[in-house]
Amino acid sequence: SYSMEHFRWGKPVGKKRRPVKVYPNGAEGESAEAFPLEFXXELARERPEPARGPEGPDEGAATQADLDNGLVAEVEATSAEKKDEGPYKMEHFRWGSPAKDKRYGGFMTSEKSQTPLVTLFKNAIIKNAYKKGH
């Protein structure tokens, strides 16, 4: 999707996503954005566990890699939830919806503003009828 700055009441919610390039022959040209997260996760798995006491793994202290992986997974989960929240909400406009006098482009105005036009037509019709008569 493209940015909607040309719209009258503001910008859409969310950022523009860049497509991820997929190469059939492996990881030749992986995008620089997606690579470090996966690479760091693999490094964290390959790294040997630090020596611990006989009581087993210390539950209070999580390694930095574990924290990073947890945060990344959490962010992905919340973004997936937001997509399927329910019915589509109109968030394109800055204040929820345009002001009433700005809606419909102003062509549905009150009847009062049309009365001079009606009078003008009546006068024109009467004049034409008068000219045809004489």
From Swiss-Prot:
It comes from the Eukaryota. ACTH and MSH are produced by the pituitary gland. The modification Valine amide is found at V13. The keyword RNA-binding does not apply. The keyword Nuclease does not apply. Its main location: secreted. InterPro entries: Mcrtin_ACTH_cent, Opioid_neuropept, PMOC, POMC-derived_peptides. One of its GO terms (biological process) is regulation of corticosterone secretion. Keywords: Acetylation, Amidation, Cleavage on pair of basic residues, Endorphin, Hormone, Phosphoprotein, Secreted. The modification N-acetylserine is found at S1. PANTHER family: PRO-OPIOMELANOCORTIN. Belongs to the POMC family. This is Pro-opiomelanocortin. It comes from Loxodonta africana.
